[in-house]
Swiss-Prot record:
Localization (cell): Cytoplasm; Nucleus
Cited Gene3D superfamilies: 1.10.10.390, 3.40.630.30, Histone acetyl transferase 1 (HAT1), N-terminal domain
Residue positions binding acetyl-CoA: F249, I250, I251, Q256, Q257, K258, G259, L260, G261, S262
SUPFAM superfamilies listed in its UniProt record: Acyl-CoA N-acyltransferases (Nat) (SSF55729)
Species: Neurospora crassa (strain ATCC 24698 / 74-OR23-1A / CBS 708.71 / DSM 1257 / FGSC 987)
Protein name in the entry: Histone acetyltransferase type B catalytic subunit
This protein's encoding gene: hat-1
Keywords linked to the UniProt accession: Acyltransferase, Chromatin regulator, Cytoplasm, DNA damage, DNA repair, Nucleus, Transferase
Length: 508
């Protein structure tokens, strides 16, 4: 290819997504944003060859997300025998419906033909009021033509905002297993308070995996017995036990940083908590931002449930001098019953429970991000020293230390099981050091999330939002608590092993 850098353009910078509405002069732009990723579309380097002054404007009608692609440039590379400018329309035709390539005039005409009483496709699930207005959530199946049409228009957002994300195959024979949730901002029309416009804010896709449930054991069963399964011709597959997986989850940039992701996730979770065939709600390859949002939402919900609140550290458990960590630090039967009731996968439930139990530790031993007098307090916690938390750290009692050690062993036991293969490659001393290092990282992360939970709880009170709108306050993770570097030091954390065994924190 040509070595002239002037002919290369960043696809992330060149591509602009615009949300528009019809106006007397054509279209009015409401919001614009760039994609985070274009590597799945334009290649790993996210570069487009063959243009100078390139602009790719993907316009969307803000309501029904009717797309229109406009490509403009100042100069185009003249093709040679060896190379030519990239055909942008051809590349994007694999990600956009044919209607996206209509003339601008046809696009504007279509916008004006959309009725004032247009509503999103699917069934209205719920509505709620946020700080910036009213929102509605709709759900539907891809087998609904209107749902399929909207999804087909917006699927390019997946490679735009999910690294490595791929659109749903609309022709898959199992397409009926997908359920789509759309989030819309509902706004009253100017001078027409009884009429509303809808503005697309985000969506999520969920897929059902059928889950075989073995029959209960009986005394009469013999080793030669084989379970049988038969259905009549009218059997509804939707009634089979399943694991429902959140596959894609996108809030578009103009609606981010408003707490809408947490709201949508919580609404979806509540829907499947009531959905009898679903035995677990799982998440496919979440990124760090989604992990944080999910952790806080799960913590907010579970910490209000009596069954979850009843899960406590049994301080009567004795700590062995050597050997395995005790398995009865928390009642395992109650743990599993609670997890199944709330349909959360084992690893995620364990993490949220560990976080909650950490918030319940005696103040003298509860880890945090440091105290206000520490030099790095503001950097670590994101709080101003002037906002207080001047309370002195109480001296831990032997009982306090015992409780903390039990909690630490509970967490380390899970981390060891999760990383058994990697840790098994290390010598005993290195294994302990590596496990201590991972534990300290998990402990730090929990402290960070508990601070977020506390601050979101305070914001909910200040904004006057209804109960459940935000994460409730939890015991402070930075109110004069032991600094985590002290915990690391106490645990003998060392540098990473030269054997480079990959040991993970075990996030779901």
């Amino acid at each position: 290819m040509s070595g002239d850098d002037d002919w290369w353009t960043s696809s992330n910078e060149a591509l602009l997504v615009s949300l528009v509405t019809p106006s007397d002069t054509g279209v009015k732009t409401l919001d614009t944003f760039h994609p985070e990723y274009t590597n799945n579309i334009f290649g790993e380097k996210e570069q487009i060859f063959g243009y100078k002054g390139l602009r790719i404007n993907l316009q969307y009608n803000a309501s029904d997300m009717l797309p229109n692609l406009k490509v403009s440039y100042k100069k185009k590379y003249q093709p040679t025998a060896d190379e030519e400018a990239l055909d942008i329309n051809e590349v994007l035709s694999e990600f956009l419906p044919e209607i996206a390539f209509q003339k601008q005039s046809d696009f504007e005409t279509r916008l004006k033909s959309i009725p004032d009483n247009w509503t999103p496709p699917g069934t209205l699930v719920t509505s709620f009021t946020n700080k910036d207005g009213e929102y509605e959530v709709y759900s539907g199946k891809i087998t609904d033509p209107a749902v399929k049409q909207l999804l087909n228009r917006i699927q390019i957002l997946v490679p735009f905002f999910v690294d490595g994300g791929t659109p749903i195959d609309m022709e898959d024979p199992d397409v009926d297993r997908w359920t789509i949730y759309f989030l819309y901002n509902k706004r009253p029309l100017l001078n027409q308070p009884d009429k509303f416009s809808y503005h697309f804010a985000g969506y999520s896709t969920l897929y059902r995996y059928y889950a075989f449930q073995p029959p209960a054991e009986s005394e009469s069963k013999t080793p030669t017995d084989t379970p049988t399964f038969s259905v009549d011709g009218d059997f509804d597959l939707d009634t089979l036990p399943c694991r429902t997986r959140i596959s894609q989850f996108i809030i578009i940039p103009p609606f981010q940083q408003k707490g809408l992701g947490s709201r949508l996730y919580s609404i979806i979770y509540q829907q499947y908590l009531k959905h009898e065939p679903t035995i677990e709600l799982t998440v496919e390859d979440p990124n760090e931002a989604f992990d944080d949002m999910r952790d806080l939402a799960d913590l907010a919900f579970l910490s209000k449930q009596p069954e979850f609140q009843a899960l406590k550290i049994d301080t009567s458990v004795e700590i062995p001098e050597e050997g395995k960590a005790p398995s009865n630090i928390v009642d395992q039967a109650a743990w599993e019953a609670c997890r199944k009731k709330f349909k959360i996968v084992p690893r995620q439930f364990a993490r949220v429970l560990e976080m909650y139990l950490m918030s319940q530790l005696p103040e003298s031993v509860r880890p945090g991000l440091g105290a206000p007098e520490d030099e790095d307090y503001e950097e670590q916690s994101g709080r101003s020293k002037s906002k207080g938390h001047e309370k002195a750290l109480p001296k831990p009692t032997p009982e306090d230390e015992h409780t903390y050690r039990l909690w630490m062993m509970l967490v380390k036991r899970r981390l060891y099981v999760h990383n058994r293969d990697a840790l098994g490659q290390l010598e005993l001393k290195e294994r302990r050091e590596e496990l201590a290092k991972v534990f300290a990282g998990v402990e730090f992360d929990y402290a960070r999330l508990l601070i977020k939970a506390e601050e979101q709880g305070k914001l909910a009170q200040a904004d006057g939002e209804t109960a459940g709108d935000q994460v409730p306050a939890t015991p402070s993770a930075a109110n004069g608590k032991r600094k985590l570097d002290e915990v690391e030091q106490a645990e003998g954390t060392a540098a990473a092993s030269s054997k480079k065994a990959k040991v993970e924190s075990g996030h779901a």
